[in-house]
Amino acid sequence: MPRTGLSKDVILKAFQELSDALVKQNVKGELCLFGGTVMVLAYSARVSTKDVDAIFQPAAIIRDAAAQIGNERDLPPDWLNDGVKGFISAKHDVVQGNLPQFPNLRLTMPTPEYLLAMKCMASRINPAESQEGDVRDIIFLIRHLKLGNAADVMRMVAEYYPPDRIPIKAQYLVQALFEEGKI
């Protein structure tokens, strides 16, 4: 697997193969995509992502098909994973957006507000922790949503997560982005 990660083309080909596998089993599947995959597919804000974070149904069938596709395409073993499920908000706002759809595979994603809240909750700034860190994605989403100040951003995060669970590093990061003129 190249160090550049999963490009839009690689992801879409893998999703087509996943849909084809579901057709053969006469099963309809759904992936709710998160993180870098949404930034690549829906917003073209990145050229690649290290993996596809998603929650999916039917989980066992999709997991098995994804493992086979990964082996055939020389993708990382966890190219499609549900590690994000521990970060899902009780206010789970998802849309189809402009994501491509496949015959037996429906794709959804969080609203931009929800995705921004998730990115702020993670607030990964070290590229070793996340392919590019979350900072670029946070900047992109704040601009996309036309939010004018850090307080507006943090109010939005609090719509999705209890205020006492919002990491202080998220508040400092967002404040610094505005103070440094990056927004």
Question: Model-derived features: where do they sit?
Answer:
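Compositionally biased terminal segments of proteins
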Residues: 1-183
